């Protein structure tokens, strides 16, 4: 992140593009993956947003009609290549990331019409979410999904995201959480394909469903369009009675019926779906997920301190809790239950306490990815073959730690969020401890050394967290919302400022905290633009943002 701030955006883009081809001998052969594609765009949205719109549209071309996606990105924008090493593998988290980037884009720009932009779908032999092969497909048919008339089918961005989320919603295991399959964000959880479930990412999908409903409502209000066009096949996933949500076998039947229908070609027919009805369906799905996790996955230790179980293993057992060998806690399940508003405020407080108790280690820069399971857990993943404190087995993993900070700020817990960021910063800024130049490594090892220090996912989330959450400079459907959560000690002489691009304007926002108030005690009461009072408010309307000079100074009074 420190390097990127000092670079031009084009240099940053080059660094992003080649990030996984750097000369670490044990890091792999290089090349970008699906998550890289979307998370690199997060940072670009802040630094050079005009590039991003078409890039996002092109990226959606990697989605399959069964909700999975191509896992290797070609050298050209929008180019996708089939299975890694010709091995079929499905990462269950992949469907969630495109929405997060698209949501940030729409909030920054107000471009909700982006939802109805169109692109094709990726096609290869992999069908039924990686469980079957399309035996009548061949290379001559190309890598784009065809309709029955042999024409390439194109659907909206909204349709792509709906397919990703709806198929995941029905793809559940025996505890009614989304199946882990080949792994989730944690690639090391790769040995529970049959019975594994990811409660952590089920929470994220649930939060996305509810936020997508808000976006559809905003689209309908802005455009006056009461309906959206969707592929006819999606009705299989939408026209389902809510009572089915509790019944695992029936959910699987819904998914199987859909996957069988879209196995080779699709009809090409589209139907109008009412926006209000679609929003209601998505809300009900998101609400169901949240309630299901809250009522089934909360676990506590002997002292009554609690957190969420984030996974089920290949034996069908909950992974986290108070075990005879010790406490088993993983950070991922806490991050996404907090971020997706699944956790109640009381649960957020409890999670932060438990994370401090079991995961925090100041000597290595903060919050570990997990506690020591004291077992090579072959019914969950290869990560347990690493020594504890290395790689995915209990290291301080910068990406997840940064997302933990983001989730805490999102819920208004600024002191707790700042502790995460500051612990990581102080460690990595100290060469004698981290052994690297200042920056964000992939992880911090048991010895405190920063490892693999070119990671754009962590860097993107650090930019987002510091700018959008800590400094509170964020978009609200194109309007400029100022909602800082800076601690009292972060102000110098009562002032704190940040400079960034917003809707094509180079803005510097300066907060004045003359009363030395702490985060949670103040809000923005007045806004001044280039010395002139704008209003007694915390938001600059989109139409007024567009009228601003190319470079502008904004002063916000806190009280």
Region locations from a protein language model:
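Acidic, mature catalytic/reactive cores of soluble proteins
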Residues: 1-559
